[in-house]
Structures are given as structure tokens and as C-alpha cells.
């Protein structure tokens, strides 16, 4: 069974509580459980991991080397600051999609730059929790196509 890893970065554990007018009312657990059910129904294994620090996320990316087929990542604020996260993703050579709940381009200027976007298969932003569904759909189609 092909494996997809869902990674969520800093502060995403606060979904449903933190600024719901920006990030929505669903909790991270709601999103993870929903995606896991969708993946399972389509014959895929979905694992998930969230951390508020850079090191645990990088370690989890390294652990995925040669045993994960696709990564869906919402790096949170690390999007705009972490060269190390970019290097970790490049080092394992696993295709990935970058997801953001809010439209980062409609927010503060410091949120407009991503260290990941140019090496991602795609970027989904501004569509709320539904963006994760679209990322999962893309991951499955990508894996089915054998690219």
C-alpha cells in the first residue's frame, strides 16, 4: 500500500481555537481523521505528524526516506523562514505539495515568500481545510500516474 505523509508545522495544533476567522473552525484532529478516512477508502495509507519546532519536522522527513511515497505539508510559519526544511525535503527526494489554509498572498508581506514553493509539485492556499482534500486528491493521482 502506498504511503502518504501529512506534515503540519508550528501552531497548527491550535486550529479551531486560533483565529478561526482566518484558519477556520476545524481542529487539526478533524482534518487528520477526515483525510485518513479518504485515503483509506481509496487504498492508501495516510500517516500524520505535527510539531511546533523545526527539528522534529526535519527528523520526521528524514525518517520518511525510502518508505513514503508522497508528502503533504503545511509548514505554517516555517514556510517563510526555514532553509533547513527545504533542504530536508530535497534530501529525501519525495514529491510534495505545500498547503496553507489562508491565502498567504493576501496577508502580510512577510508571508508572501516561501522557501518550499519552487521545489513543490504544487501549492494550495486560501481554500481552508478543503485545500488538504485537494492535496490528497493530487497526491493519489500523482502516485497512480507513476510519475
UniProtKB/Swiss-Prot annotation:
Involved pathway(s): Metabolic intermediate biosynthesis; chorismate biosynthesis; chorismate from D-erythrose 4-phosphate and phosphoenolpyruvate: step 3/7
Keyword Ribosomal protein recorded: no
Active-site residues from the entry: 23 (proton acceptor), 100 (proton donor)
Entry-linked InterPro entries: DHquinase_II (IPR001874), DHquinase_II_CS (IPR018509), DHquinase_II_sf (IPR036441)
Binding site for substrate: 74, 80, 87, 101-102, 111
UniProt catalytic activity: 3-dehydroquinate = 3-dehydroshikimate + H2O
Listed CDD domains: DHQase_II (cd00466)
Site (Transition state stabilizer): 18
Superkingdom of the source species: Bacteria
SS bond partners: none
Enzyme class per UniProt: lyase
Entry EC number(s): 4.2.1.10
Any one biological process term the GO annotation gives: aromatic amino acid family biosynthetic process
Keywords: Amino-acid biosynthesis, Aromatic amino acid biosynthesis, Lyase
Recorded GO MF terms: 3-dehydroquinate dehydratase activity
Family: Belongs to the type-II 3-dehydroquinase family.
Subunit: Homododecamer.
NCBIfam families found in the cross-reference section: aroQ, PRK05395.1-1, PRK05395.1-2, PRK05395.1-3, PRK05395.1-4
Primary role: Catalyzes a trans-dehydration via an enolate intermediate.
Protein name per the record: 3-dehydroquinate dehydratase
Amino acid at each position: 500500500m502506498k504511503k502518504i505523509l501529512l506534515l503540519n508545522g508550528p501552531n497548527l495544533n491550535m486550529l479551531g481555537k486560533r483565529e478561526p476567522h482566518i484558519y477556520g473552525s476545524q481542529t487539526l484532529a478533524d482534518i487528520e481523521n477526515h483525510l485518513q478516512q479518504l485515503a483509506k477508502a481509496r487504498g492508501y495509507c495516510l500517516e500524520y505528524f505535527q510539531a511546533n519546532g523545526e527539528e522534529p519536522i526535519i527528523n520526521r522527513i528524514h525518517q520518511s526516506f525510502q518508505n513514503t511515497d508522497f508528502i503533504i505539508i503545511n509548514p505554517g510559519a516555517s514556510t517563510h523562514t526555514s532553509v533547513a526544511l527545504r533542504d530536508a525535503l530535497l534530501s529525501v527526494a519525495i514529491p510534495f505539495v505545500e498547503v496553507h489554509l489562508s491565502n498567504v498572498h493576501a496577508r502580510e508581506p512577510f508571508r508572501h515568500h516561501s522557501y518550499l514553493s519552487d521545489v513543490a509539485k504544487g501549492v494550495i492556499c486560501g481554500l481552508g481545510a478543503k485545500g488538504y482534500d485537494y492535496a490528497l486528491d493530487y497526491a493519489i493521482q500523482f502516485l497512480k500516474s507513476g510519475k
